[in-house]
């Protein structure tokens, strides 16, 4: 089983995102509309698994498949849709086999893009909710140190509730 470790907030995470996003953007070329930093490392002052999550919006999702070899040269494994229709998913491990990056690619403006960005922006704008999320992640990592599936399942209800609030707030603005 994969070990679950959450780390204290790291001021390097945004810089790590910027550096990697620049390389991914070069690979995607003129197909890329925008690359966003998502996931817990994109939310200030919370504990996170030290994995940089990126969400790339593209103008043509089918053109992404032609980039698989270039992404592999950058160290990524292409996993196709990986359970989410319309997505292209890549992950990257370091030399020790530890996960360092995820790249989720969707058609620009898709519902998945809107959902991910709404959650991130809601958590950034609501530090109390972000702190609750951080505390939950730490508790789950302590409870399930060797069970990533139980850790993820434990976050699910909270994340869905926050996504719902985020989408409701977005609809009102």
Model-derived features with residue positions:
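Short histidine-centered catalytic/ligand-binding loop motif
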Residues: 5-11, 56, 119-123
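Conserved catalytic core of two-metal-ion nucleotidyltransferases
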Residues: 76-111
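Histidine-centered active-site/metal-ligand motif
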Residues: 36-37, 101-104, 116, 151
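Catalytic cores of NTP-dependent nucleotidyl/adenyl transfer enzymes across multiple folds
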Residues: 109-173
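Short amphipathic alpha-helices in soluble, non-transmembrane regions
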Residues: 66-74
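Active-site nucleotide-donor binding segment shared across nucleotidyl transfer reactions
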Residues: 23-65
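Short, flexible turn/loop "capping" segments at secondary-structure junctions
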Residues: 1, 45-49, 114
């Amino acid at each position: 089983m994969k070990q679950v470790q959450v780390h204290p907030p790291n001021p390097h995470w945004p810089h790590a995102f910027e550096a990697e996003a620049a390389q991914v953007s070069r690979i995607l070329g003129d197909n890329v509309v925008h690359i966003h930093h998502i996931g817990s490392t994109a939310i200030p002052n919370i504990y996170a698994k030290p994995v940089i999550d990126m969400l790339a919006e593209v103008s043509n999702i089918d053109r992404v498949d032609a980039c698989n070899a270039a992404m592999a040269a950058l160290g990524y494994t292409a996993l196709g849709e990986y359970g989410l229709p319309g997505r292209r998913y890549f992950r990257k491990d370091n030399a020790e086999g530890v996960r360092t990056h995820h790249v989720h690619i969707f058609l620009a403006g898709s519902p998945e893009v809107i959902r991910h960005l709404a959650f991130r922006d809601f958590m950034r704008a609501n530090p109390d909710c972000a702190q609750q999320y951080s505390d939950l992640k730490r508790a789950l990592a302590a409870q399930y140190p060797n069970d990533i599936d139980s850790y993820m399942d434990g976050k699910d209800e909270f994340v869905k509730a926050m996504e719902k609030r985020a989408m409701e707030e977005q609809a009102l603005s």
